[in-house]
Amino acid sequence: MDVEKLNLDNIISRLLEVRGSKPGKNVQLTESEIKGLCQKSREIFLSQPILLELEAPLKICGDVHGQYYDLLRLFEYGGFPPESNYLFLGDYVDRGKQSLETICLLLAYKIKYPENFFLLRGNHECASINRIYGFYDECKRRYNIKLWKTFTDCFNCLPVAAIIDEKIFCCHGGLSPDLQSMEQIRRIMRPTDVPDQGLLCDLLWSDPDKDVTGWGENDRGVSFTFGPEVVAKFLHKHDLDLICRAHQVVEDGYEFFAKRQLVTLFSAPNYCGEFDNAGSMMTVDETLMCSFQILKPADKKKYPYGAGGVGSNRPVTPPRNAPAAQPKKGAKK
């Protein structure tokens, strides 16, 4: 399909048609429509900086992981675009049952509102990861492997960090021992895969750890953990107020670290149908005051989200030091 002929409004309205339906109902766009979404959004990502400079007010969301009906709930709470400006912190695909609907709606909104709707890259927007954790299988089952490769080309062009009003630094994972200047992020060339070490890897993979002084080993086997004083030094050096990141399940959907100098956001409630966590969205107003909207874990009988679906036999990325968000009894880790 010629990208210029992409009927965006029609695509968005079909994706939104399932609002109010029983969760799990699929929306089957045509292959050429999805290809068009990937190609057009890729052009937009490349036309915008890899380190976005954004202005408040806006709403920030953490991991969604293919939980499409929860994404719709987020928009119902926060206002469907263009009613509010949005920044998503990555991890759109894998684990949940409807990665395709999730990523297609997000890409469609990016194309429709390029200056008001922003998507960062998460560690799952990477071929070697989403090959394993569900997205590849969903593409293969519902379309074909070629389409999965088209998504890979798109994901390789996503921006990796954002700064809001020169005060709030946002990325998917966290800080890097290699990060001395913002210019280093700006110099990362796209398209690019995510390497298994170095600055880009750390921005997408690292985690805060209250028990670490400086930098520590990461249980994920990738990147590092960083302690509270690393956060304080980074903020002071770059004249920032807050780091906002995602990447870890937290029980209340948001969790502060290092005297409220860092916040973790997670926007997939009942993650994988195995956790009892809430999801949340952070609203940043014009004065940079931050508040949280909470998506409570849905009633299981009413909303059988992830239970037993795609990903039910896949290991969940373990939350670090978050005993409150452990799986329910009998759930697979």
Curated annotation (Swiss-Prot):
Cofactor: Mn(2+)
Catalytic reactions of this protein: O-phospho-L-seryl-[protein] + H2O = L-seryl-[protein] + phosphate; O-phospho-L-threonyl-[protein] + H2O = L-threonyl-[protein] + phosphate
Tissue: Expressed in gonads, nervous system, intestine and muscles.
Active-site residues, as the UniProt record annotates them: H124
Residue sites binding Mn(2+) 1 per the record: D63, H65, D91
Uppermost EC category: hydrolase
Physiological role: Serine/threonine-protein phosphatase essential for chromosomal dynamics during meiosis and mitosis. During meiosis, promotes chromosomal cohesion and germline immortality via a small RNA-mediated genome silencing pathway. Antagonizes the function of air-2 kinase during meiosis I and mitosis to promote chromatid cohesion and spindle attachment. Dephosphorylates histone H3 at 'Ser-10'. Dephosphorylates histone H3 at 'Thr-3'. Also involved in the activation of chloride channel clh-3 during cell swelling and meiotic maturation.
Full protein name: Serine/threonine-protein phosphatase PP1-beta
